[in-house]
Amino acid sequence: MAKTLYDKVWQAHIIDQIGEDSLIYIDRHLIHEVTSPQAFAGLNEKGRKVRRPDRTVGTMDHSISTRSLAIDACGPANALQLQTLAKNCEEHNIQLFPVGHQKQGIVHVMGPELGLIQPGMTVVCGDSHTATHGAFGALAFGIGTSQVEHVLATQTLKQSRAKSMLINVNGKLPVGITAKDIILAIIGKIGHAGATGHVIEYAGEAIRGLSMEERMTVCNMSIEAGAKAGLVAPDEKTFAYLEGREYAPKGQDWEDAVAYWKTLYTEEGAKFDTVVELEAADIAPQVTWGTNPGQVIGVNTPVPAPEDFSDPIEKESAVKALEYMGLKPGEKLADIPVNHVFIGSCTNGRIEDMRAAAQVAKRGKVADSVTAIVVPGSGAVKRQAEAEGLDKIFTDAGFEWRLPGCSMCLGMNDDKLVAGDRCASTSNRNFEGRQGRGARTHLVSPAMAAAAAITGRFADVRDYQE
């Protein structure tokens, strides 16, 4: 029977069947300071060791300051998390990239750029956006703290097989439309729970045309559609991206790896539980208006009314979202003022994102009413951006250029908003209070965020691109 990409990766990692569940082997385990302390504590209490420290890599990202390299810059609680991670990694001989290390970065940015993630792998992390790594044709998903402990101890995980979903994005992307617009449009179409219980495979001409960094953006937000994971089949772009990276295979091992990677595709006639079709030509620059990523519209579309939704749950959700966001049905996004802009995160903190935002930023100055920060996703991204002069473009335009970290994506460090603030953000979640209690978050692409910084409102980025 014809197999999907998901079938192939899943079946290659089954160790044993436990009733209806499978015990699968984990190839790569990424850890950070927030979800690992309790896991290591459990390990130590039971007198266990980390089974495969060589397959485990740690970084500091969530709780760190983007203003200072001091480990205690975000207060004693955050400092304790960071110190605990360092202690645990040292005791268990795990490679750690701490604050200030040249390879440190957001876990889902530094992992790929080091070549730690490769096609056909199983990848887990105590973080919901682990799906990012599916861009390489890896089965990657977030896990809870108890599961982190289990993987540390056994390098395995008990899992039930998910359903499969194929999402085809047909045709070429129009000028000015980005990977962020693709994934927001997908979530807008199927809903923020539309892929619950599924692993998504993204395909179609528009997806094949994306760079590896753009594919990471798409896969990153699979969880916002409710999915377990998101995948893109590896191709020549994947191989070119990985070749020569620090942890990628070398010599004959590389040749053997590529030969295997080329078998990782969905075979003709393979069956999916669900198939979704989108036309790339229909996608406009996207902006979320509500409090979940599925509440999203094109930048020139009026804010919807609750009556526009037939589902009673969606209707009630719209009522609450409009109230929280301080919006009225029929309003134009171009009339809505923004006072904060955040460019960064594991969704859009890579070098191509920095370049896209800088292209818009150089066309103006940050509006007097706006505070705008740019946070590179890793030390490598920061150095590359500075080598290209992007930092100067940003600072000359009035943006703040920060140190790498998760930053304003979540209210877990010192980059927070206050009640009533309205932020154009390149992150992945617009939940109530995500960026600070009472703060209002609108998800957009890096270019759209830069345009919002300049205009002080939501503007169609296509008007600001050459």
From Swiss-Prot:
Q: What is this protein called?
A: 3-isopropylmalate dehydratase large subunit
Q: How does it assemble?
A: Heterodimer of LeuC and LeuD.
Sorted alphabetically, which keywords does the UniProt record give? 4Fe-4S, Amino-acid biosynthesis, Branched-chain amino acid biosynthesis, Iron, Iron-sulfur, Leucine biosynthesis, Lyase, Metal-binding
- Per UniProt, what is the name of the gene that codes for the protein in this document? leuC
Matches recorded under Pfam families: Aconitase
One GO MF term, please? Answer: metal ion binding
Record Gene3D superfamilies: Aconitase, domain 3
Q: Give the residues the record marks as binding [4Fe-4S] cluster.
A: 346, 406, 409
Give the protein family. Belongs to the aconitase/IPM isomerase family. LeuC type 1 subfamily.
**Main role?**
Catalyzes the isomerization between 2-isopropylmalate and 3-isopropylmalate, via the formation of 2-isopropylmaleate.
Q: Which pathway does UniProt place it in?
A: Amino-acid biosynthesis; L-leucine biosynthesis; L-leucine from 3-methyl-2-oxobutanoate: step 2/4
| EC top class, as a word | lyase
Q: What does the record give as the organism's lineage? A: Bacteria, Pseudomonadati, Pseudomonadota, Gammaproteobacteria, Alteromonadales
